[in-house]
Amino acid sequence: MENILDPSVVNSHILENGSRRSSINPILDSELRDKTFEKAHRRSLTLLSSFTSSMLELPNNGKEENHRRPSVARSSSDRSKASAKEDLFSEAFRMAEQPPAEALTISTPVDPINIDELDRAYAVSPSDTSNLLHPPTSSSSIPIPIKNAGHSNLDHPIRPSLQSSISSNRIIKSPGIKEDDYMHRGRSISSPMIDVEHINSTAVPSKTKNLPEKPKRSHKLRNSITFAKIEDHPERKSQLRRLSSSLKCFDPEYDYNDPSLSIRRDSSTYYFSNVNETYDEEDSDLDSETSTVNWVQSVLNLPSLLSDDLMANPKNKERFEWQYMLTSVLTGDIVRSEKLRLRKIASSREGRNSDYSDNLWMEIWCWLTHRSVDSYRENLKHLRTGMVDVLLAIMNFHWDESNELTPIVAVDNMLQKLDKYERLYPSRRSILQEHSLYASESFQHKLDVLTAYSNVTHALEIQVNIIRSWVGNEEMDITKNTTNSINNVSQISNGPFVERFYRETGLIRAFEQRIMTNMNSVLSKVCNTIVTYADDLKSYGLPLIADDYMRLLSFPFRLIKEFLNLRLSCAENITSISLFTIDSLLDDLRNTMKVAVHIIQQHTVLIKPFRDDSKFVDENQSLNNILVASLKFYFNLLHRKVRNGCALLHFKETEILEGEWDFLLAVCPHIEHGFQIMSKSLSSLVGEILTNINRYLKDQLQGPDTDDSALITSFYIKVLDCVRIRFRKLMSFTRILKAHLENSCEYVIKENSLSLLIQRLEESNHVLTYTASIEHEGAYVIVPGHLVDSPNILREVLSMTFNKGDNNFESVPPYAVVLAPDSSICWNGHVTDLDIPEVSISIAPNCVRLVTLATANQLSVIEDYFISIVGDTVSLVDSAKANSSKINKQMTKIKRNSLKLALSLLDVIQTIRTRYHGMNCQNLIHYSFSYAIEFAQRLMRLSILDASSIGLIRRKMIQLAISWVGFIYEDCSPTDRNTFRWTVTALEFAMIMTYGSNILMIDKKSFEELKEKVGKCVALLLLHFDVMGTKHAGRSMDQQAGDIPARLVRNNSDRSRLSDNELASFVKEEVMHRIIELESNRRDRLYKSQLIGRVLDDTTKENRLLKELASSKSNITIRWQQGGLIGSGSFGTVYRAVNLDTGDLMAVKEVALHKPRISRPMIKRIKGEMLVLELFDHPNVVSYYGIEVHREKVNIFMELCQGSSLFEFLRYGRIEDELVIQVYVLQLLEGLAYIHSCGVSHQDVKPENILFDHNGIMKFTDFGSAKMSGSASTKIFEQLTQQEEEEFEKDSEFLQHLDQNRGYSLTGTPTYMAPELILGNPSERVGAMDIWSLGCVIVEMATGSPPWPRLDNHFSLMYHIAAHNPPIIPADDQLSPLGQNFLKRCFVSDPNQRATAAELLMDPWVYPLRAGTEFDLMNSSVVESAPSTNGAPLEL
């Protein structure tokens, strides 16, 4: 039992065991210790006011108000915050130490105040607490809130500061405060009904009694104190009264002894600042006066807003005189001397504050321990005698191997001893005064080191324990296999930690919350401590806690490495990969590599104290190798996506690359050879896309098999627009890529100029550099002299394959000259060595390459500088190229493919003109000419091609101009008005292409042909010229009106735009992508508190229900990864998932089992859907794979339909082609006929539950509301094992529940619900309600809106259906008569007379499709076929 007489024990309660380790930052540790100790000391000073307020009471008959300044008062909300946690002594000590009964009086709660706001002159001495009845603050007891110092999860309290503690009644510094201000502040929180002199004279140690009320004397005392100093100086008083009278500030008729006057002065006249800044003696008048003068001067410098006439008005003279008088009073000698005198008085009181606080602390403990001050002081002297030994022990502390205690235990014991003795002192100032060793800098430094060591060691232990608990084993082995089972029947969760972690897809959330935030925060502080105190710890014999530190530091590396290894191994097992699988893998790799790079960035800094640790270097290298493999696999997937993408990706190929740009720029710098892989792969992708565009153009040029000129024109316009859009986007991206990859230019050495070139390089202070790698290719590296001392920059210049463009050079960028002479050279300049990685540059003999850090857009600057040095000894060959031979090869391939595509497009016009000559396709041919000219001009402006390629395109354009002029004369009708407009355009283009020296590029034969055709076109123009205006005047208004639609039609045909379906698809994809992201984030938050793999206790009802599902034969264990959200409903949420064993995509329906929801009906519903799905095996019903049971959820694995749902399809409008509706209805009937033949009724047929797979096949899903007939129950029993039969016998009502109860329950969606379900009279015929629902779905497909669109609520809808009102049959323009008769058979009110699915398959509306009349058309819609070489292009 603790000794209450021991002040160290009592003080430990007062300090509330504040931990020394509340902060483990070694730099800020001393400051935090000072602040925490100061808070604890100030709470102990507040204790007296709390006790006296609870014991004492001042009678108040309601005659006087509680006059307290607003700054002290607290609101009711603040009072409510003074809870039991804050009120440390209000209840505990009242129960332990009850004051005498005669000392207690009735008290009323008022606003609590802080004792720091009390003036010492009016505070009652703590030694007289047994003799007082009334508190010195107000007429009611005032509870003082004791603010907690706060607890930490560490054990040692923070040491107090070296500053001397500030008294509880410190003076608040405020501008312009005077002595009477200070005195008045003390009175503002004291009652005017207290007679201080009477209290002091009547205080008797042995007993207490109530004091009589003497308000008049109290008022006199108050005001006598206020004006005492002025009464001592009659001259000053008279001067102040005369001045105040003139200023109307003091009225001679006022009674200055009136208490109301002081109240008003307290609330309005005086300003009390809340700034917690103590007044120092060094603060002089000069500071405040200087600041005041500066402020006044700044106000006077403001421009006046009044006019000069108003300022000079004699009527305003009185105001200026008054203001001048006010200024004279406040800036005169009287006020200045009074301010100085009051400051000196306040400064003299400051020295007495420390003694007062020490006495207050002493008297508090005397009161608590029921001892006198003298005896308690003697006891303290005896207890403090061991302080010197503890200080010496700390100064001499050194741990060695012979010590029986571990380093951390030895340090903790030493700090605990010091804490015990520190509690024996009221403040650190007292310790400093008594022990000079404690105040020494060496002692404080060693104490800081030991405290920091204790903090970081315990923090590391806590973090290691957290990670061990998370992983599940003491070794923190993430690959260790752990298995938990339920009664050895079925396994709920198994596998290593990395697989369980991978399965839940909480990678980003886990790393951000558990590793990146918490663990990295601890590691960074440990790193700072080790770096700061490494030498000190070594001198004290304390180890550097490297084991736990390195164990934590390597954990993220091992986890992310295993995660990537697992992902890559699973990807290798994928046999058939689809576009959806590629997107899922790309997204997974992208997120994982981001996390891995983030780990590398943060831990590069944290490894500094152990940079030579070989284990960490090996782990870093192994992680980098995995990242390299992941990056290569990432680009492999991009290649597959671009190569095997659907037609929708034709317009988005470049957007795919642009979307990956920012990610690659963030990841590749931190992967070894990352930029090299990125540059090579991106350039290869661009070249592959160019090849695809060229192949697409070649295939589509064969044209459609039709003679209709309108269809032919529309076909080719769409083809050319598609090529133009794809090529334009790709060239824009290629220009960006070219600027980052091409960082050099190449020159050829002129004949007999090699020696002169060498001489000029020597004279310009260039240095020959031996690299031991480039010399093998017959080349030499020459660098500027100022870069010799910067080898890292030179290595970056020579080995750089990708320039990020983030370098800002004030002058010439760093560069290197690679010289490949064709003969031997003699270098007379400086020579140095440079070790660089092996780089393949492939430079031709007799050439010079200028390599720089500048981008391709900045090469011109370095080229001019280089030419200024070498002069005319070289000539430019290639203005921009990549220094790496592999990347330059890819860029050359891109340029060659771009030129090939451009020439193919220019040749397309002649092909189209020849093929469709005489077929009235003049509009198409003219559009082709305009298209080719625009395309060629854009290509030359992109600066992708070199000079030779541009010259070749220019020659092609000249030939195109000649052919265009020939087309106008030979193929166009002279009387057509379009011919005149086309002729002007063709002649203008011919004029531009033959301008200047271009006319000399035409051979003689072509020039003669051009002259002839131009002459004929000019003659053609003369037929359309209307010089006198007679032709125009003769035109009628009807002809003009008739021409307007023609112009509109032509403009519309020339317009290139995307179709509505294509735009809608783009918008839909973007919206779905955003929705999936939001749902994925929501799912991660919901998985935060999961409990996986625990053993079930079958004694509880909930666990018994889970055991029923876990014991099912369909309970499977597979390795899978959860993907994005597909949809959610009231029964569960569906996600996309990947089978890690096979690589197949699947859908996972997650049913949450929160405890309020775990009931027998819920389990029966899950089990019922599971049994129903096990019965089915049909192309038009989703396949069922099995279930996976967890404590908090059940996962149902089903087939993934990747083509959205019928509901999403109908959101964009009705299906206009009735043949498509017939194909869809035939598939739905096939599926319903099979479902009904199994004895199951779906009971929830609606567009949301009809899905499309990737081939367009429709499938039924969501059998949560299905009803099973007797035949289905029999079939289920035939498939049961003996163990399952025993379980069903125990639960005999289960199948009855499936068979009967659901049939009579109101299940489904009201819009598609049959009348018998609403009326509660279901038919014995299986699936009759499904036929009604199918008819409603057909109505929605034909009309675009659900049945009864005008009924706005479910109640009116159900009432309408219950009245046997069928939906409105679509009109004749929406559905044929056969289709209308089909719907009438579906909407028969009597379910027994309603047609079945098998009967409807024989209906004339769908039977021809089933029999094969239209089967070819249906087959082509659902089977993927090779791209047609003669059909129309896919219209999106």
Swiss-Prot record:
It is an enzyme of class 2 (transferase). Keywords: ATP-binding, Kinase, Nucleotide-binding, Phosphoprotein, Serine/threonine-protein kinase, Transferase. Its EC number is 2.7.11.25. Residues 282-1123 are annotated as: Interaction with tea4. The modification Phosphoserine is found at S224. PROSITE patterns: PROTEIN_KINASE_ATP, PROTEIN_KINASE_DOM, PROTEIN_KINASE_ST. The active site is at D1244. GO terms for cellular component: cytoplasm; Mcs4 RR-MAPKKK complex. Residues 76-85 have a biased composition (Basic and acidic residues). This is MAP kinase kinase kinase win1. It comes from Schizosaccharomyces pombe (strain 972 / ATCC 24843). The lineage of its organism: Eukaryota, Fungi, Dikarya, Ascomycota, Taphrinomycotina.
